[in-house]
């Protein structure tokens, strides 16, 4: 669930001389993005947001069953439609490596259910992507 702090965190982007961009938050987070090799595109960041949200949402369920420090490997891809210049769907594969735990089939199924439940309940990004989300934009030109 989104907390109040997430709603008031200030985020902004700035262009670099080399053409890449940097994203910042007022609490010190930073990521480079743009077009080209070695940087994430905005579309990549959408997919990373979805995977990251699933990772954080499922972390407790996985650590509770396996041990601290364990987590899922989450791969997200999407179908891009050039006509609408939009992603029309995302596919998320959540893989939990529990080979060291030697879980029974029943315990593995319980973990799968818990991970699914935690992501379904707690992933704000997924909740946002599933619904149609209005975006308001205001353009200001300073002179």
How would you label these PLM feature ranges?
Residues 5-48, 59-143:
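Extended beta-strand/beta-hairpin segments
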Residues 53-54:
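Alpha-helical metal-binding/catalytic segments enriched in His/Glu/Asp
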